[in-house]
């Protein structure tokens, strides 16, 4: 029986307020309006960004809200004017949209898109309203995705059709973590054969940076993390050395140590932690004259980065990167094909699985430090 044009009642994990566990609720999902797509979400990843906003530290966080931004599923229905996808298409949700019309999209210089940024940041769809209701209240959307609901409504520029044969419990992770790190290495940094790479933080994004660096022939890939259990993960993905700054001899400066063991510093470093002191260390351990440090991690609201200007005057570059510099609607299908062809690891990131009713366990797993990615089965 078709649900097109009707309100769908389904389960969702609702965050009623910051700092509290998610609540499994029956919500109403309204039909898509013009240039919107309603998606049956089959699998979603759980990301540190979801936990960050749930904690209350995110200045853009609004409650009550349906979190989740690593989602894959099938198009259930489309609104007027939607041409990019059709009912039944396998899709990945995109928290970084691609309209192909705005100043950003047309610049050829960035993967950012400005078309729906203002409303997305407020937790609303492009017309300034919500498609979620629960207990008589509207719920906010999250990052233009809201994949913690069995059905969601997104802008048509925030979803991409992908290959039907690609397993959705894997493609969901290409919606954020895996793509973010891998793209930062191959797209933003454009690592070359023989480069020396420093990766600060060995979670999902850091491990993704490693596999990007390996694919480009980096000669040294040194991972810096204060959790010794991450060494085995770093090794599995291709790191050549693991450094735990907390176990170095007393009085050892981590920047001086890294410069010493790399004969002058790294060609590229990547901050995958969101810690502003680590960001500084990542920059200052770059090679004088040409080293580049790419910031991927999201810092807490109000935090600022600092270094001596001389670090930049002498040739180091500080650069930022969102979603791996990937244009989602244009480039995601080829990334999925690379996964299908065995060129990108995705399965290896999945350490935990839960059903929607147990989604809070995924957040507890993440904070325990032994979880790379948890995947939630939505139905």
UniProtKB/Swiss-Prot annotation:
<dbReference type="InterPro" id="IPR036291">
    <property type="entry name" value="NAD(P)-bd_dom_sf"/>
</dbReference>
<keyword id="KW-0862">Zinc</keyword>
<comment type="similarity">
    <text>Belongs to the zinc-containing alcohol dehydrogenase family. Class-III subfamily.</text>
</comment>
<keyword id="KW-0520">NAD</keyword>
<dbReference type="InterPro" id="IPR011032">
    <property type="entry name" value="GroES-like_sf"/>
</dbReference>
<protein>
    <recommendedName>
        <fullName>S-(hydroxymethyl)glutathione dehydrogenase</fullName>
        <ecNumber>1.1.1.284</ecNumber>
        <ecNumber>1.1.1.1</ecNumber>
        <ecNumber>1.1.1.-</ecNumber>
    </recommendedName>
</protein>
<feature type="binding site">
    <location>
        <position position="47"/>
    </location>
    <ligand>
        <name>Zn(2+) 1</name>
    </ligand>
</feature>
<dbReference type="GO" id="GO:0005829">
    <property type="term" value="C:cytosol"/>
</dbReference>
<keyword id="KW-0560">Oxidoreductase</keyword>
<dbReference type="GO" id="GO:0106321">
    <property type="term" value="F:S-(hydroxymethyl)glutathione dehydrogenase (NADP+) activity"/>
</dbReference>
<dbReference type="Pfam" id="PF08240">
    <property type="entry name" value="ADH_N"/>
</dbReference>
<feature type="binding site">
    <location>
        <position position="102"/>
    </location>
    <ligand>
        <name>Zn(2+) 2</name>
    </ligand>
</feature>
<keyword id="KW-0479">Metal-binding</keyword>
<dbReference type="GO" id="GO:0046294">
    <property type="term" value="P:formaldehyde catabolic process"/>
</dbReference>
<dbReference type="Pfam" id="PF00107">
    <property type="entry name" value="ADH_zinc_N"/>
</dbReference>
<feature type="binding site">
    <location>
        <position position="176"/>
    </location>
    <ligand>
        <name>Zn(2+) 1</name>
    </ligand>
</feature>
<feature type="binding site">
    <location>
        <position position="69"/>
    </location>
    <ligand>
        <name>Zn(2+) 1</name>
    </ligand>
</feature>
<feature type="binding site">
    <location>
        <position position="225"/>
    </location>
    <ligand>
        <name>NAD(+)</name>
    </ligand>
</feature>
<dbReference type="InterPro" id="IPR013154">
    <property type="entry name" value="ADH-like_N"/>
</dbReference>
<feature type="binding site">
    <location>
        <begin position="296"/>
        <end position="298"/>
    </location>
    <ligand>
        <name>NAD(+)</name>
    </ligand>
</feature>
<feature type="binding site">
    <location>
        <position position="105"/>
    </location>
    <ligand>
        <name>Zn(2+) 2</name>
    </ligand>
</feature>
<dbReference type="GO" id="GO:0004022">
    <property type="term" value="F:alcohol dehydrogenase (NAD+) activity"/>
</dbReference>
<dbReference type="InterPro" id="IPR013149">
    <property type="entry name" value="ADH-like_C"/>
</dbReference>
<feature type="binding site">
    <location>
        <position position="113"/>
    </location>
    <ligand>
        <name>Zn(2+) 2</name>
    </ligand>
</feature>
<comment type="function">
    <text>Oxidizes long-chain alcohols and, in the presence of glutathione, is able to oxidize formaldehyde. Also acts as a S-nitroso-glutathione reductase by catalyzing the NADH-dependent reduction of S-nitrosoglutathione, thereby regulating protein S-nitrosylation.</text>
</comment>
<dbReference type="GO" id="GO:0008270">
    <property type="term" value="F:zinc ion binding"/>
</dbReference>
<feature type="binding site">
    <location>
        <position position="70"/>
    </location>
    <ligand>
        <name>Zn(2+) 1</name>
    </ligand>
</feature>
<dbReference type="InterPro" id="IPR014183">
    <property type="entry name" value="ADH_3"/>
</dbReference>
<dbReference type="GO" id="GO:0106322">
    <property type="term" value="F:S-(hydroxymethyl)glutathione dehydrogenase (NAD+) activity"/>
</dbReference>
<feature type="binding site">
    <location>
        <position position="48"/>
    </location>
    <ligand>
        <name>NAD(+)</name>
    </ligand>
</feature>
<feature type="binding site">
    <location>
        <position position="99"/>
    </location>
    <ligand>
        <name>Zn(2+) 2</name>
    </ligand>
</feature>
<dbReference type="GO" id="GO:0080007">
    <property type="term" value="F:S-nitrosoglutathione reductase (NADH) activity"/>
</dbReference>
<feature type="binding site">
    <location>
        <begin position="201"/>
        <end position="206"/>
    </location>
    <ligand>
        <name>NAD(+)</name>
    </ligand>
</feature>
<dbReference type="InterPro" id="IPR002328">
    <property type="entry name" value="ADH_Zn_CS"/>
</dbReference>
